[in-house]
Amino acid sequence: MLYYALVFLIVAIIAGVLGFGGIAGASAGIAQVLFFLFLIFLVISLVAGLIRRT
């Protein structure tokens, strides 16, 4: 149990350093681009599946 507490402490420290640093803004921008990219892939996949069925 102590092992998991230490692991979560280390993860929290790393997340805090990255969150309060300048990396958070860049990561959010990259995540937003990837979200829309995969959303487009989803729509293309759905349309291709519907076309293939008919």
Curated annotation (Swiss-Prot):
Its main location: membrane. It comes from the Bacteria. The keyword 4Fe-4S does not apply. Keywords: Cell membrane, Membrane, Transmembrane, Transmembrane helix. It is found in: Cell membrane. NCBIfam families: PRK13682.1-1 (NF010226), PRK13682.1-3 (NF010228), PRK13682.1-4 (NF010229). This is UPF0391 membrane protein R00741. It comes from Rhizobium meliloti (strain 1021) (Ensifer meliloti).
